[in-house]
A protein has these predicted regions:
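ATP/NTP phosphate-donor binding region
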Residues: 1-57
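Glycine-rich beta-strand-to-loop/alpha-helix junction loops that act as flexible
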Residues: 4, 60-62, 84-86
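ATP/nucleoside-binding phosphotransfer catalytic cores, i.e., glycine-rich phosphate-binding loops
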Residues: 12, 177-183, 208, 218-245
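Catalytic core of DAGKc-family lipid kinases
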Residues: 35, 74-188
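Short Gly/Thr/Asp-enriched flexible loops that form oxyanion-binding sites at enzyme active sites
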Residues: 65-77
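Glycine-rich phosphate/pyrophosphate-binding beta-alpha loops
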Residues: 131, 135, 190-204
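Gly/Ser/Thr-rich active-site loops/lids in small-molecule metabolic enzymes
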Residues: 146-156, 199-200, 205-225
Length: 245
């Protein structure tokens, strides 16, 4: 399942010839399906997963494409999901050493499936991190900046951060976690199955995607002058040492 508009290049033009070559070498029975609109990956994955017999779905795109394919495959025991990262952030594969192993299609085809945790929410299945607050505002702003020429990948994230910190900061939250109620004014909240998001921000350095646990990261409301340092620490995974986290 290929998202042709993932990242800054035409993923279908780059990937499809490689997929055909790798699949032919492995003598696979396969289909190449291109997404045509947001959410189409869910529909395509679900349609394939509902057919009889085992199926492995390769999400070829960014983290958004992977999320759609997982949502479509979720609940079907016959379906496996793999990832071919060609998006702008590719944070999912950072949990497993980066993009390089996942771009070796021959090894990926031969690889064995392993169990992985997902996050179940009232909006459906999530893969790595669910967030609210400043980081969520940043995520909403990213598509606008990606449309600017030469503004892909981490640059779009950084420009969206600048826009978000120029507006109102902080939210009053009431959180129930492990039978404990937490109330306060927070800059952001991240519920983490994986360790990174936002193009490499290391939100939960110790998060593991197959240990059965979620890590809850809370950042208290702080002033704008402190945010620059927080963002630097957050990107490196050093924010857990601060008093406001």
């Amino acid at each position: 399942i290929v998202n042709p508009v993932s990242g800054k290049a035409d993923a279908s033009g780059l990937l499809v010839p490689r997929i055909i070559q790798a699949a032919a070498q492995q003598h696979l029975n396969y289909q190449i399906l291109l997404t045509e609109k947001p959410g189409h990956g869910v529909e395509l994955a679900q349609r394939q997963a509902e057919q009889e017999g085992p199926v492995r779905l390769y999400a070829c795109g960014g983290d958004g494409t992977l999320n759609e394919v997982l949502r479509g495959a979720y609940g079907h025991a016959n379906a496996q999901v793999a990832c071919v990262p060609c998006g702008s952030g590719n944070d999912f594969v950072r949990n497993f050493g980066g993009s390089a192993p996942f771009l070796n299609l021959e090894d990926l085809i031969q690889g064995e499936a392993v169990p992985m945790d997902l996050i179940e929410t009232d909006q459906g299945i999530a893969v790595a991190i669910c967030s609210a607050g400043l980081d969520a505002q940043v995520a909403y702003g990213i598509p606008k900046f990606r449309r600017i020429p030469l503004c892909g990948g981490s640059m779009a994230y950084k420009l969206s951060i600048l826009q978000a910190v120029s507006g109102p900061l902080g939210h009053r939250l009431r959180i129930c976690a492990d039978d404990e109620i937490i109330t306060g004014d927070f800059l952001m909240l991240a519920l983490c199955n994986g360790s990174t998001y936002g193009g490499g921000f290391l939100a939960a350095p110790h998060a593991c995607m197959n240990d059965g646990f979620l890590e809850l990261i809370l950042v208290r409301k702080i002033g704008r002058l402190q945010i620059a340092r927080l963002i630097g620490d957050y990107q490196k995974g050093l924010h857990m040492q601060g008093d406001q986290v």
